[in-house]
C-alpha cells in the first residue's frame, strides 16, 4: 500500500483537493505524513511537502480560517502549516534543482500573500516568465504580482514608487493580454477577460508608460560621490535592502535611495512632528547598521586590531576578527530597531499598555486586538517568523523556521556566539554554553535579519498610511490639520 501510494500520491492529493471533503483531505494528509516520515531529503520529499501544503491550504479554505483572528487568540493552524510546508518544499526544490520549482515558488508567494505580507509575496512572484511553458505558475505569478502592485500603489505616498508599481503592473498585464490564447489556467483566463481593474489598466497603460519613461530618465541620472558609494549602493540594491518600495520591483539605479518616510498625518494645531522624527531615528539606525554590515562582509579590517588582546582559543578555528564582530554588532543594531518600532506603534496608534514594548507576537496581540488593519496583520505574522517560542507559554501558533534568527539575537545580547569552522572538538564540552555557527551561517543570517527589518519598516509605513485614510479630518476634541513633515535635508541650519 505504501509503495503504491508513493507512486500515486500527487494524483491522490489532487483528487482529495478536488473532492472538497474534509474527511478525504484529512485521510490523505495522514497517509502523506506517514510516507514523509520515512523519506529522506530529495525531489520526492520536496513534492510531498508541496502536496501537504496544498492539502492544508485547501482545508483552511473549507474551514474558513482567517488570518486576522489572532486578535482573539484563534490561529489559522492549516494556513500556518501550509506556509511552513511550502517553505520547506521550496528550500529542498532549490537544493535538488526540481523541475517543479516555479510552481512551488508561486504557491509560496500565494501562501505569503494570504497573510497580507504583500511586499514579500512580490519577491516570490518574480521570475523569468515564459508563456510558451504550459504550467500554471507562468500565468498565476505575473497576474497575482500585478494585482499586488496595484493594491499597494495607492498606499505609496512617494510618487515615483507609485508610478513604478503602476508601470510594472501594466507591463505584466499587457504581456498576459498579448498571450491570452496560451493561458491554460481557467481562473486567470476569466480574470483577464472580466476584471475591471485589468481593463482599466490596459486602457490607461500608454499614459502610465509615458510617465514611467520620464521618471526613469530622471532617476537614472544619479551622481556618486566616490567609487565606494557606487559599490555600496549596488550591493544594497542587489540585496533589496534599500528602504524604498521601488527596490522590490527593480535592483538598479532608480531604486538607489532610502525614500520611505513617516506618512503625512493628522495632528492638533501646535503639535510637532515627533512621530515622524521617531521613525527617522529608526530609519537612520537601520541605514547605518546596513553600512556597517556592508563593510563587515566586504572590506577587511586590519589584523593589528586583534594584536595584543591575548584571546583564548579552544582549538576550533575560532574567528575573532573585527569583521566578524561587526557582523554581530550589525545584527544587534538591526534587531534593536524592531523594538523601537514597537514603541512607535504604541504611541502612534495610542495603545494603552504598561511596561516595555516588544516586537513579538504576544505583545502585538495584546496591544492591537482592537485595531483592524491589514498591515498590522502583516507585522504580526512577520513577528511570528522572528520569534523563538521555546520558552513562551502565552502563544499558540506554530514556530516558523526563522525563529533561529531571534535565538541568534538573544544569544548575541545575553549569551555568546562563537564563530568556528570546526566540525568536531577535542574537549568534553560540559562548560561550553555558546551558540556556535560558521562565518557563512552568520553572514547569511545577517542578510536575512536585515531583509526582515526592512520589510517590517515598510509594512509599518503602509499601516500608518492605511490608518490615516480611515481617519476623519477632525478629532472630537479640537481642530486638527494634516502635518506635512519637514526633513533634515530641507534645513540649511539648525532650528535652534
Question: Model-flagged regions — what are they?
Answer:
Residues 1-12, 20, 60, 206-327, ...:
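Charged alpha-helical initiation segments
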Residues 406-408, 426-496:
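Amphipathic, Lys/Arg-enriched alpha-helical patches that create a basic surface
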Residues 126, 157-184:
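TPR/TPR-like (Sel1-like) alpha-helical repeat modules
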Residues 16-35, 72-88, 114-127, 163-168:
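Helix-turn-helix repeat elements of alpha-solenoid scaffolds
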Residues 315-415:
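Short non-catalytic regulatory patches outside canonical folded cores
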